[in-house]
A protein has these predicted regions:
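Post-DEXD/H (motif II) to motif III coupling segment of the RecA-like Helicase ATP-binding lobe
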Residues: 129-195, 341-342
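Conserved segment of the helicase C-terminal RecA-like domain
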Residues: 307-349
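Conserved pre-motif I regulatory segment
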Residues: 1-34
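Conserved interdomain hinge at the start of the Helicase C-terminal
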Residues: 200-246
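Conserved nucleic-acid-binding Ia/Ib motif block in the N-terminal RecA-like helicase ATPase lobe
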Residues: 3, 57-124, 132-135, 245-257, ...
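Non-catalytic terminal extensions of ATP-dependent helicases
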Residues: 350-437
Length: 437
């Protein structure tokens, strides 16, 4: 394993990751990995895969199929953070295929992270050379089947004639692996146990609401949790927006996330939550899978998960790797914990005296230039320090996208930054600077 990459990432491999790397690097067989949500499966396949791909070649060598655009984007970012020298690109619906095709020609990625439908489109139009692809990874294989991508995946496999190795990853066990995947000799790695479904390091609480409408109890619960990061799960998009609006009106700094939002809105919501400028994320189950946000302290079930699998994946957003976390069920009148919740739990008593909502230290700004304008993180820091009057210590996480950039900055400096940078140029290009709310 590349120790330089591990040191850069600041991680130590767990048993599942070590076993996966060993199977990929040393057995020559296809690999199936079953491991709980939050155990680090993205690193498990990427760390060995990057050692088998040729960074000096312009050929596309590996395809990673994922069930949704968020996982495609996050997986590409994980690879970027590893600093392997490999070029990658996420491919997903909701944006023009022609634009993706142009970027494919320019970037010449060695690996793509793609949703099945969009990859099929590019293969059908010969935008991708299928002959050079030797590696196939299907991440969240169980979810791909659950979402009904079986026909799309079958079509993809028929168009990839030279696949030599396959890696399938899942948090749950599928009844069978469909024949179209064409698994050869296979190493099966199962790191699931009954005890690991909900790790012991997650503490389970119930909170009683005397009213069917639980918003007041949710407000008090969040007040009692202070500045800790929390995801509030609901089952309906309208409920997400209603709840988020209620919390905003009561002084909380909130992001919300569901499938009807535009892609940029979804990216902004996740970015504000992950960089700490919005410590509360209100979401449907869309946020329960595929999102790699490492430091979520609390999971709150405003609406109960509809299935045990949904419960496991919601709770898997906290206590990732070896960290601790808490999960809360808000119980309305006549509501009881679902039968599948078998862990020990205790009643959470909300203190009578509560402080005002905690205000995060950071806020997020949008800068209207990105990679396509030859803008780097160093350029962003220089611009904000020179033109925006910031110290480097007042700048947090920076995410440079193709056409724009998100930056976490000190909340107390927001108005000053926007005033000072109005009409200013970055690398000779005039740009827009706005707060992301």
């Amino acid at each position: 394993m590349n120790n330089n990459i591990l040191n850069k990432l600041g991680i130590t491999l767990n048993a599942m990751q070590e076993a996966t790397a060993d199977a990929v690097l040393h057995t020559g067989k296809d690999v199936v990995v079953m491991s709980p949500t939050g155990s680090g499966k993205t690193y498990a396949y990427l760390l060995p895969l990057i050692q088998r791909l040729d960074a000096s070649s312009d050929a596309l060598q590996a395809v990673v199929l994922v069930p949704g655009r968020e996982l495609a984007l996050q997986s590409a970012n994980v690879l970027k953070d590893m600093g392997s020298g490999l070029r990658s690109m996420p491919l997903y619906g909701g944006r023009p295929k022609m634009e993706e095709h142009r970027v494919l020609r320019d970037v010449k990625p060695q690996i793509v992270f793609a949703t099945p439908g969009r990859l099929n489109d590019h293969l059908d139009k010969a935008n991708i050379n299928a002959e050079t692809i030797k590696w196939l990874v299907i991440d969240e294989f169980d979810k791909c089947l659950e979402f009904g991508f079986q026909d799309e995946m079958m079509s993809i496999l028929c168009k990839l004639p030279n696949i030599e190795r396959r890696i399938l990853l899942s948090a749950t066990e599928s009844e069978t692996i469909p024949n179209f995947v064409s698994m050869g000799r296979t190493v099966h790695l199962d790191y699931r146990t009954e005890d690991e479904n909900i790790p012991d390091r997650i503490r389970l609480y119930t909170v009683t609401s005397p009213e069917k409408d639980k918003l007041e109890v949710l407000k008090k619960l969040l007040l009692s949790l202070g500045d800790k990061s929390s995801i509030v799960f609901l089952n309906y998009r309208d409920s997400v927006e209603r709840t988020a609006l209620f919390l905003k009106e009561n002084g909380f700094t909130v992001s919300w996330f569901h499938g009807s939002l535009e892609q940029r809105e979804r990216e902004a919501a996740l970015y504000r939550f992950s960089n700490g400028s919005a410590p509360i994320l209100v979401s449907t189950d869309l946020a329960s899978r595929g999102l790699d946000i490492p430091d979520v302290d609390n999971i709150i079930h405003y609406h109960f998960p509809e299935t045990e699998d949904s419960y496991v994946h919601r709770v898997g957003r906290t206590a990732r790797w070896d960290k601790e976390g808490r999960t809360f069920f808000i119980l309305g009148p006549e509501e009881h914990l679902p039968e599948y919740v078998t862990n020990e739990h205790e009643e959470y008593k909300i203190p009578e005296t509560l402080l005002k909502p905690a205000q995060p230290r950071m806020a997020t700004i949008y800068i209207g230039k990105g990679k396509k304008d030859k803008i780097s993180k160093i350029d962003i820091v220089g611009f904000l320090c020179k033109k925006g009057g910031l110290k480097s210590s007042e700048i947090g996480k920076i995410d440079v996208k193709d056409r724009f950039t998100y930056v976490a900055v000190s909340r107390t400096k927001i108005k000053e930054i926007i005033s000072l940078t109005k009409g200013e140029k970055i690398k000779g290009i005039r740009t827009v600077v706005e707060e992301v709310r």
